[in-house]
Amino acid sequence: MALPWVPQPASAAPATSSKAKPATATSKAKPASATKPAKKDSAAAPSAGPATAGTGQALKLGQFEDWIAYSTPGARKICYALSVPKERLPKNLNRDPGYLFVSYRPDEKVRGEIAVVMGFAVKEDAPAQAVLGSTTFQLAGKDSSLFVHNAAEEGTMLAAMKKSASLVIKASSKRGNATTDRYSLAGIAQALDQAEKACK
């Protein structure tokens, strides 16, 4: 499933703070050693702009700690909240930026769809998981993205995300590399509230 509304990396990343800095979209993971070349997985890069085709640039609704809410103009309105990983492992794996999205698409009757852009082609037949404390949700891979395997669990997962401090995404690349991305959930409740209101 494509994510045509993926924002431009430079404008999408939440601002860094004096605490742990989220990965900026213009930087790539650096090799662990200067003498050891980084491995690179083939990846489908995020689309050039933050809106669907023909709708123009997305409007930033607000930044809430580590999350940003956006909406797109045009007839087919899309609203979403996003964040970038605080930590990506293994550090020596060179890949494109990653994002965690929650989207609202009224024309498609979609509300609160969770999606993760991994920054590399995922191994679609391998297990992928979203871990919130002691609770684990199974994910399904498609191209370079992950979605909740059982869509009926999205509401439960969103409720858990609003109450948790962080979310860990575990997945394997098409080349077989096991990866772990950690996202901060600080500000997600407010960002989701803004995105949902904008797409009522």
Give the role of each language-model region.
Residues 5-200:
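A generic "folded-domain core" signal
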